[in-house]
Amino acid sequence: MPLTARAGHTLHRLPLSHYWWLLLGRHSLRHVHSYLRLRKGLRLPLPWPEQECLHLHPKPYKFLLRYPCLTRQPHLLQGWPADSSLWFDPKPYHPSADSKLLPLGLITLSAFSMRVSEPTHCSGFHAADPSLSWLTGSSPWLVLLQAPGGSLFCHDVFQGRLYLLSHSVSLFLKTGLRQCEAIYRAPLWRVRPLPSLWTCRDPDTAFLPKLLARTARRGLAAFYALWRLHLGSRSELSHPVLEWERTELVLTDRRRGWPCTHLLSGSESQRVSSSDAGDTWNAATEKAAGGKEEAERGGRQQATDRLASPHLTRGRRDCGRSLQGEEPSAAEDFARCRPLLDELCGEGGWLPFAFLTASPHVCLILTEGGPVLALDLNDTSLWRIADDLELLLRLGSLLLLSGLRLPLRPPSGSGEAARKPGYEKEEGRGRATTASATAATSPRRPTRPRGVTEKGRVTTGDVPFSAHPESEEQTDGHHGRQESGHGDQRGGDGRGHRDDGARRHANDETEPQQRGEHEDGEQTDSGREEDAQESEVARRDEKGTEQGGSGRSCGRATQTYGGRGEHGAWSSIPLSVPRPDPRVWVPPPHLLFPSPLPSITPVEDEPSARPRCPPGPAEEPSKCSPCPPCPSPDAPQSAVPRLSALSVPSPSTARVRFSLSSLSSSSSSSSSSSPSYSPSPLSPPSPVSPSSPRSPFISPIRSPGLRAKPWVSSGHPVAFPPAPSSAPPFSKRVPSVPSSASPSAPCIGRSRPPSAQTA
């Protein structure tokens, strides 16, 4: 019985009777292609909408190449199969795709109400035909595609977009083209009510955020592929406490311009926007090459004003654009933040995926490691809101208010706007606000630069670094030395002393001026003597540095850590190392990406790190109950450890490095190895995954089940040992009192027999 579509029996037949041949793709898509060659030209009704049909064709793209309206637009031909090929390449639309798709046929959506039994000939495909307005693109042409895994896709030919219809054939037989956005642009389906199988709740609002959050686990490539398919969709963030408080998100690409309420599916508009950007860049290049100094100076002045004080144009950006009819400059705002985000998250390691409907100037950014950032384009501030996208969906808008905003703006003294009379006062006020906020949240001093001296050194509150830093490693080293201690606790490589001397020598002239601002010009004799001593020490250190040959040779110039060489103030660096802009202040990465405290592995030969007390001569210790150490009369009361007081301290206190020191047994007396610890200074944060316990951010909130507390084999949490001075002396034998709190628990504070150690 031939499979034909009849008008009277279309609604009563099961879709499986028409599309059973799709199940052949489970074995090989070659079997599906063989069926298409045998049934070429057959029209099958779709599962939904039932009034539309699928025209089976083994090579539908070869048929579409007849029309010049498609061949004249090369951007629409991306991924199309070649003449001798059958497969459609989805990588231009789906970057993480690893297999090609097999075209099944063509779907022409009707522009007006027409009967399914009415034949549609190829001769009727012209602009004068009122039934199909395909030339304007209002009635899309769709190509149905199948993947080797059974997934079905739909390619919009005129818009150049690829949609994922379903992940299996059985799901396609139930939903049809419901997940294809192109069908709702057809004139027939714009005012038509939704079918009965359609859920009353918007599927994008309910299912899309969960799907995006799960896809973000696999990285930015997989997230980008799904995010591009659903541009323009809306979703909501619920509040964990106030259920009626909901924050709406719109998936859009903020790098291309201001967000629109409709679907951003038109590749023509994207091509126009990119060409406009290219024309603007070419025009600016021609102006600079032609010698138009006035236009160049005016453009530089506007750019400097926008970089220096972005808060001055907030009112005009928010409310004045709609009234004056100006074009929004969200792309310009993002172009200003792009180099800062590249330096902070790495080039290609961040993606702005959505913006808030209530606050369009706030956009959400997903980074490579999974943390979600929020960027405010009005005041150019950035803050971390969640560790991953799943946590953001669970806690909702509550996380948008947490965290400390870090301003991404250049310091004072950059550009021509610094010469304005009110600019220094405004920047000084902003600098004081930032310094007070940083000092209130962290014990360290602010590290924002205050000025550049004649010798290329940047004057800061406590940490010196070069105005043209030699490399990123040295800049991170300065931050690490500042976090590891005060002025007397520098790095162990001796580099901090040379830097300190060079800083005192370079800032010898600016120190009296800065001290005069704070002390109203009053300086005592002792202060002058200290300045003289500091200058002598600086000259001695600098002379020893130059004679000792501590500089690094790079080419013909000698580069030292003090910032001096054959070229004077400019330090010579290898050409392969890029020199960052010294005027732009970027917050250190450990402020936005704090890593948790590393897990502590238990010691193999001693499961418990607590020192034990030897038992008394007349009393044998129990084998089942734990024996906590008893207080000795000489030891203070506060130094005695208790089982209830043993807990892991918070990461904001300090880190402790453990090392085992075995006591050598001289004669027949049995001596056990007692663990000792040595507190190590805080290591400087690494640029990839830094960790700063003194970060001004709140401790990161992580979703349950991601990282559990470290546990030892005995079932008790890992605890820090007490100080060596707090342990009772081993010379005295104190009788141990067995505790009956947990009789079934294993022994705590007692070394296990050799059999248990080997097991």
Swiss-Prot record:
The superkingdom listed in its UniProt entry is: Viruses
Show the segment(s) annotated as Disordered: 269-328, 406-759
For bias kind Low complexity, which ranges apply? 406-415, 431-444, 659-680, 691-704, 728-746
Q: Where is the composition biased (Pro residues)?
A: 585-599, 681-690
> Composition bias, kind Basic and acidic residues: at what positions?
289-299, 417-430, 469-518, 525-545
Q: What is this protein called?
A: Uncharacterized protein DR1
